[in-house]
Amino acid sequence: YGYITGATNVDPDIKIDTRYVGGYVDTTLAKEYGLSMIQDNKCDIIWGVAGNAGNGAAEACLEQNEWFIGVDSDQESTFSSDLAAITFTSGLKNVGNSLVWFFDELDAGKDYWGTEIKLGLAEGGVGIVTDKNFDKYASEETKAKVQEAIDAVLNGKVEVPTALTEEGNNAVISRRDEVRP
């Protein structure tokens, strides 16, 4: 949902092809979907948010000479050299930062048991990779737009909605359907 929010804030007319493989290990189906997204809908970048299955989407990008966005960690650093070469950036789930935050809070005598805590961009809970391929291949205009988008979230101009409630999930489905090719 954050991806759609960010992309449509930068380009209100953008089209986003969203597909679900239904699990985290089906690389074959993810590759099939990736190839279809590129060949049928002219997707020029794919974010494979599906655990190991996303690697199939990366393989589709490699075969079609398109960019891939990694997920959870810096996949450019963990992929084989051929897949790393087409990984433009990665959406980061900074689990290490959340663990440090939790133990710092615990050491300070704060107890959050039973409380929902959201560690977003401002707290370092999530982020994106802006060095390596991104730094090398992104235009200055793209880098500026990415920084503007980050700043808009940090200063509250853009609120990243959640899908963790029924209302939020319904909003995600509606928004996803609005931007389909």
Each predicted region: which residue ranges?
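A residue-level marker of the well-folded mature domains of exported/periplasmic proteins
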Residues: Y1-P181
